[in-house]
């Protein structure tokens, strides 16, 4: 079978698979970014309940393989009354798994911001939320981009 005969026979199926893969990539990346920011900030909280919740989530999803998580989301959750379509189960499992790794990247990026930046924001009398939003978060993107894009 020649290349062109194979492509004419299986090309539409391969194209459909490529489009589905791109959809999963985009949706799980959006979920990954949201989870990473939320749980990365939760991990730095001084409240032990918030920090503990983030730690349990991160350690669970980093400690189990993605294949096991995909299996659980698609095959085991229906036993508990929560049935997800294959696409949704894949997006949620991949997003939550990568989000756990991303949360540690965000936490490390925040801790890598020089202490002088924190002190400068404190000297300007910024609230903790404004300090993060205006000073710290914009500075972490160059720090976290290489490990997050790897």
Label for each model-derived stretch:
Residues 1-150:
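Transmembrane alpha-helices and adjacent helix-loop boundaries
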